[in-house]
Amino acid sequence: MTVDFGRVLTAMVSPFDKNMELNLPMARKLARHLVDSGSDGLVVCGTTGESPTLSKEEKLELFRTVVDEVGGRAVVVAGTGSYSTKDSIALTQAAEKLGVDAVMLVCPYYNKPSQDGLYQHFRAVAESTNLPVMIYNIPGRTSINLLPQTCARLAEIGNIVAIKEASGNMDQATELRRLLPDHFHIYSGDDSMTLPLLAVGGKGVVSVAAHLVGGKIQEMINAFTSGNITLAAKLHSSLFPLIKGLFMTTNPVPVKAALGMLGLNVGPPRLPLVEATEQEKEKLRVLLREAQLL
């Protein structure tokens, strides 16, 4: 299976109202805004979408809403992975019925499976669906690192077609590209690593910063792919302060605050995350002004 998700996918936040319930009208508005401002696709209910705090029913509501709003205009990738293989299969199959274009499966967190356990988990979920699958490796959150050799085994499964690589290790990214077939796409899971990953054969990024600067990220990637490395590096440097600022505390706390400042009231995060402090908000305002967004 050969699939092109595009270059810039936004890891979309999950909007909440004042009662901390899903704000589906805002989810529609945000999805439209992201696609209109440069996103090729949206990843719904991933880390940035606070997936662990959402019930299965809430996740399905978000999948349904985003597909209805931007399906056909952008790729909709449903975050259906968890530490339970059985639950991941059930959510994946339910998401498929709603018309999502693909699923993203995070490495099982907390229970720390072996490399063979990771392989068996991803294979079982992939074999339960006809959808293309993107694997999500983020050892800083899951405490387990999917090794390139394991990913290469998984790439032999027909519908496992991409990885969101957020190890932050360029040696690992290089080894992934060396071992994986050309049609298997590698996406950066860290905005600050997008340009370095492109340099070793990456496809694009699953981005937090694209909530705010999706067009600029597209411009940077286009500059790189057209051979204008100097311009790509200049754009990377200009985006870097804002990108780092969006991780001054746990994601998605800063990006939710920033969206609110720009008139997209997506609400605060659910507990156990808490909203940005006044000091953090002031730092964000400065960064948004410097980026000419405020």
Curated annotation (Swiss-Prot):
Active site, renumbered: 136, 164
The reaction(s) this protein catalyses: L-aspartate 4-semialdehyde + pyruvate = (2S,4S)-4-hydroxy-2,3,4,5-tetrahydrodipicolinate + H2O + H(+)
GO CC annotations on file: cytosol
Entry EC number(s): 4.3.3.7
Keyword Cytoplasm listed: yes
Domain of life from the UniProt record: Bacteria
Residues marked Part of a proton relay during catalysis (site): 47, 110
Pathway: Amino-acid biosynthesis; L-lysine biosynthesis via DAP pathway; (S)-tetrahydrodipicolinate from L-aspartate: step 3/4
Pfam families per the UniProt record, alphabetical: DHDPS (PF00701)
GO biological process per UniProt: diaminopimelate biosynthetic process; lysine biosynthetic process via diaminopimelate
Residues the record lists as binding pyruvate: 48, 206
NCBIfam families: dapA
Similarity comment text for this entry: Belongs to the DapA family.
Subunit text: Homotetramer; dimer of dimers.
Protein name: 4-hydroxy-tetrahydrodipicolinate synthase
Species this protein is from: Desulforudis audaxviator (strain MP104C)
Classification lineage: Bacteria, Bacillati, Bacillota, Clostridia, Thermoanaerobacterales
Gene: dapA
